[in-house]
Amino acid sequence: MSTGKVVQVIGPVVDVEFSLNDKLPDINNALIIQKDNDDTLTVEVSLELGDGVVRTVAMDGTDGLRRGMTVEDTGSSITVPVGKETLGRVFNVLGETIDGGPEFGPDAERNPIHRDAPKYDELTTSTEVLETGIKVIDLLAPYVRGGKIGLFGGAGVGKTVLIQELIHNIAQEHNGISVFTGVGERTREGNDLYFEMKASGVLKNTAMVYGQMNEPPGARMRVALTGLTIAEYFRDVQGQDVLLFIDNIFRFTQAGSEVSALLGRIPSAVGYQPTLATEMGQLQERITSTKKGSVTSIQAVYVPADDYTDPAPATTFAHLDATTNLERSLTEQGIYPAVDPLASSSIALDPSIVGEEHYQVATEVQRVLQRYRELQDIISILGMDELSDEEKTTVARARRIQFFLSQNFFVAENFTGQPGSYVPINDTIKGFKEILEGKYDDLPEDAFRQVGKIDDVVEKAKSMVTD
């Protein structure tokens, strides 16, 4: 392989010169810089400047680098371990373990992080709903197998618990695998998530990849590809349905923006990199269903200054199939999961995909909840007595629906003391249909809180009467 030397260091960007007689490394190749203390630094080729010089982005800090240091071309892009051995482990962008466990040997199976998206003839053409067992999602904003879902929510509204429950349900009901990718988020949150997942028993079905806030932009820019590469192996080689969590997709864009100017590119709108749409597309197009399996991605989306026209979230939205919005006002009412039934949406909520009955029940639930929201101002000012009999019935059913959208989670059993519930989609539709028909108008509202199926509501109501 070719050998060169460091000629310039500008923050996370390193220029490397090779002899004109040697073969220049390809774009996206990984180069290894030999540092003075027997340590090494991996950099990735981004540009060829001419005269044997390439411009690279460092995957770790460039402290201690100096001109003249030896650089070796590895001959390929960054490669990371793949396969069942990755489950239960935590990796960095280079596929090195960071959980204190044993390292992967040189004979471990590895794949390059830069790969082409599946070809058209490999894709599955059918749109299939992925059952999660979570009522509010399955009924009102169903996930598409191999789709991309945006998860919106502030701090403390239950994003982490919802993620854990999805990982648990996919593992238990679908024998599925999950890959969690922490992109540019707080190290403390990543640490907490690791120990919470260990305690709740879902870690054994999960591979975790972290490139957190304190790491150089090169690592944050590529760590999403590392997680995706691990997920693709489970899909393509083992025929699995994989859940890929990316938290936070905005940080992927932000990291690219940080190095773009240093690479010599002229900034585009709002200072973002001119290659924003291309970089996002290369990542998102690899997340899809093939005839072998699927990668379904749930991406936390940070919206800077709540500006949805900002190029970063706007570019992300173009790829999303569904959105799950978590609402703080629901947590204040003790409704978990705190998914906003009116703000959340999905392209799969279509009679040709979910069926006519599911579609009719879902739209009627949304209509009743929307009418209840409109009546709340009147109720708060004038009271319930000013409503017509029809409006009183609508309010009563809407409150029962709102409470019935909640349920106990398996991963929260240790905290709530209540057993979790997985609700099949047919039971979900049956329950809401019967509430809308008025079959349970005589049952107390509290019987609908934090239960699974509609039969559980009836049982809970009986026990409340007995007590």
UniProtKB/Swiss-Prot annotation:
<dbReference type="Pfam" id="PF00006">
    <property type="entry name" value="ATP-synt_ab"/>
</dbReference>
<dbReference type="InterPro" id="IPR005722">
    <property type="entry name" value="ATP_synth_F1_bsu"/>
</dbReference>
<dbReference type="GO" id="GO:0016887">
    <property type="term" value="F:ATP hydrolysis activity"/>
</dbReference>
<dbReference type="GO" id="GO:0005524">
    <property type="term" value="F:ATP binding"/>
</dbReference>
<dbReference type="InterPro" id="IPR036121">
    <property type="entry name" value="ATPase_F1/V1/A1_a/bsu_N_sf"/>
</dbReference>
<keyword id="KW-0472">Membrane</keyword>
<dbReference type="Pfam" id="PF02874">
    <property type="entry name" value="ATP-synt_ab_N"/>
</dbReference>
<dbReference type="InterPro" id="IPR004100">
    <property type="entry name" value="ATPase_F1/V1/A1_a/bsu_N"/>
</dbReference>
<dbReference type="GO" id="GO:0045259">
    <property type="term" value="C:proton-transporting ATP synthase complex"/>
</dbReference>
<feature type="binding site">
    <location>
        <begin position="153"/>
        <end position="160"/>
    </location>
    <ligand>
        <name>ATP</name>
    </ligand>
</feature>
<keyword id="KW-0066">ATP synthesis</keyword>
<keyword id="KW-0406">Ion transport</keyword>
<comment type="function">
    <text>Produces ATP from ADP in the presence of a proton gradient across the membrane. The catalytic sites are hosted primarily by the beta subunits.</text>
</comment>
<keyword id="KW-1278">Translocase</keyword>
<keyword id="KW-1003">Cell membrane</keyword>
<comment type="subunit">
    <text>F-type ATPases have 2 components, CF(1) - the catalytic core - and CF(0) - the membrane proton channel. CF(1) has five subunits: alpha(3), beta(3), gamma(1), delta(1), epsilon(1). CF(0) has three main subunits: a(1), b(2) and c(9-12). The alpha and beta chains form an alternating ring which encloses part of the gamma chain. CF(1) is attached to CF(0) by a central stalk formed by the gamma and epsilon chains, while a peripheral stalk is formed by the delta and b chains.</text>
</comment>
<dbReference type="InterPro" id="IPR020003">
    <property type="entry name" value="ATPase_a/bsu_AS"/>
</dbReference>
<dbReference type="GO" id="GO:0046933">
    <property type="term" value="F:proton-transporting ATP synthase activity, rotational mechanism"/>
</dbReference>
<keyword id="KW-0375">Hydrogen ion transport</keyword>
<dbReference type="InterPro" id="IPR027417">
    <property type="entry name" value="P-loop_NTPase"/>
</dbReference>
<dbReference type="InterPro" id="IPR003593">
    <property type="entry name" value="AAA+_ATPase"/>
</dbReference>
<dbReference type="GO" id="GO:0005886">
    <property type="term" value="C:plasma membrane"/>
</dbReference>
<keyword id="KW-0547">Nucleotide-binding</keyword>
<keyword id="KW-0813">Transport</keyword>
<keyword id="KW-0067">ATP-binding</keyword>
<keyword id="KW-0139">CF(1)</keyword>
<dbReference type="InterPro" id="IPR024034">
    <property type="entry name" value="ATPase_F1/V1_b/a_C"/>
</dbReference>
<protein>
    <recommendedName>
        <fullName>ATP synthase subunit beta</fullName>
        <ecNumber>7.1.2.2</ecNumber>
    </recommendedName>
</protein>
<dbReference type="InterPro" id="IPR050053">
    <property type="entry name" value="ATPase_alpha/beta_chains"/>
</dbReference>
<dbReference type="Pfam" id="PF22919">
    <property type="entry name" value="ATP-synt_VA_C"/>
</dbReference>
<dbReference type="InterPro" id="IPR055190">
    <property type="entry name" value="ATP-synt_VA_C"/>
</dbReference>
<dbReference type="InterPro" id="IPR000194">
    <property type="entry name" value="ATPase_F1/V1/A1_a/bsu_nucl-bd"/>
</dbReference>
<comment type="similarity">
    <text>Belongs to the ATPase alpha/beta chains family.</text>
</comment>
